[in-house]
């Protein structure tokens, strides 16, 4: 082993200095000759060559150190090694060894229960080991050694080569060479940059000299150019009043053009002459900076002004960005929000006007009388008229109604009260309801002579047993008891019968194989509610679909009673579900977190011992459509042969009561269908929940009391659908299919 090591060290000592010296020489801008090399550079190269042995010793020193390995707590180990020298190997080979020609390893330990071990490569301890093994291999042929002995010797020689040490030394040498190359490249880059700068300076100086020479030649060849230019300049500045006179003529021409333009407009009426400020303020409002935007919802039109009023252009430009501009237009915060039932118009009180304001106000009152009288007014004699409160500061005018018994007065209101509508329980004849009118359209109609017919709301009565109306929510206006079973004014009317259901769109993968996810159709936000599994007592809320995909829930509701099945719904801020193992249905208020209503289904055919497995559908299933809340459950047919039938009943969302007039017994049978849902008062049932290509094989129309077999294709993409619910707000079917949350688009036939 000693000979290969000596060869490697000798090669490194010879090659590396020559390589380094060649690199250093090539790094200069001009290669020096032998005579031009300074004595200082020769001394530096010689010192570097002499120090190569020290550098290699430093490279090998940290590797040749013996490593100490310790075991135990509070243990400190130290290894002291005394290796053999090269002369010791020679004495051992010559047979004249001494007592000190042995390497020793001493272990120094400190600490309780401490175990130390010293690890070192053989070449670091006994440099004679390589020579000894090489000699043995050479004598193997003459001594007829066994193959196993040769293998042992080869293995020892292989380990004695100490390839790890060679690799470490090579890596460090390569690192040093890389550093040298990096430094040389930096020096070359700096020198190149310096050369470029010198070249730029030389080029700039040459250009300057060339221009100076050219200018001198031009001046020499054309001596009269400078004098001619001086004469022209003197002529141009000889009359200083010329520029002022030109500007004055331009201003006069602009004034003449503006006067001619204004004279072409027709003159206005005499009573409109003094109205100047409102027009200026409206124009100034349009010129506000972009940092204070104003949304204009209404425009007041005035007749043309005389030419004298239009000449005040400079005054308008001076006040263009002033803060004294009055606001006489409708802005977004003052508008009454259109909820689909009522229409109102509000205006800010105008500034004090003279002459013209009185005429316009009287004319506006005279023209808006039919329109104002059409608004519903509070009256004890006719309870079908609705009480409507205006919003924001309004124009205090009293309109003259054609009917003296119904007088309409618009009063200012500082706050926005809740809009309520009162109706009678019995139907009364009413005119057909025209389409809703926006505030801007109503204002424009009020300024014309054509009156708008009165708007009335027609509702259907359910009889004397109609329950109380729902509470108001931020997402929908308060409805009367007759209108609580028909929310088409809030969500939208049905377009027609169901035509097609598109393929499923996977929105998320969440939870277990069974579960339900739903949205509140009457909510203003996009919150998603999830019940994981078909039994439990926790309802999880997500802020929107994106948070649901990320698994970031925003709220959790611990229900006082457990639910069973997947037929729950969230409707008008409440969670409706079937209490586990009972005939009870519960309405849980999500905002107040309490049980708002409780009811028992006396005729439900409930299985007392429900097996702990999914049967393909829920025994009690809630549904929501454009008409409100529905309940689907199995019951015994009292009129027939006491068979179980599926009952569809319109459910009162306030107290969970049902009525016989709105309860239908369908032709469905339990355990013969998968999932069902209601769209526009029609019950649809899917024939299978665990087949990929299923069909909507049953439909019952509550409007005509007829049932058909539509045979519409319904795809269970993951072949395990445990919930299908219709949302009338976005007209989508929400389904839970084997742990995947999917949606279906509903297409209607026109």
UniProtKB/Swiss-Prot annotation:
| Biased segments, Polar residues type | 354-384, 393-413
What are the protein's UniProt keywords? Answer: Coiled coil, Disulfide bond, Glycoprotein, Secreted, Signal
Annotated region (Disordered) at 346-437, 452-484
Respond yes or no to whether keyword Coiled coil is given for this record: yes
Q: Which residues form the signal peptide?
A: 1-22
**GO CC terms of this entry:** extracellular matrix; extracellular space
| Mod. after translation | O-glycosylated and N-glycosylated.
Task: State where the protein is found.
Answer: Secreted
Q: What is its main location?
A: secreted
Q: State the Gene Ontology BP annotations.
A: extracellular matrix organization; signal transduction
Pfam family, any one: OLF
Top-level lineage group: Eukaryota
Going by the UniProt annotation, this protein carries glycans at: 187, 213, 695
Coiled-coil blocks: 40-68, 179-213
List the InterPro entries: Olfac-like_dom (IPR003112), Olfactomedin-like_domain (IPR050605)
Any one Gene Ontology molecular-function term assigned to this protein's record: extracellular matrix binding
Olfactomedin-like domain residues are 493-750
Q: Which SMART domains match?
A: OLF (SM00284)
List all disulphide bridges recorded for this chain: 494-680
Q: What are the Low complexity biased-composition ranges?
A: 416-430
Quaternary structure per UniProt?
Answer: Homodimer. Binds to heparin and chondroitin sulfate E.
* Name of protein: Olfactomedin-like protein 2B
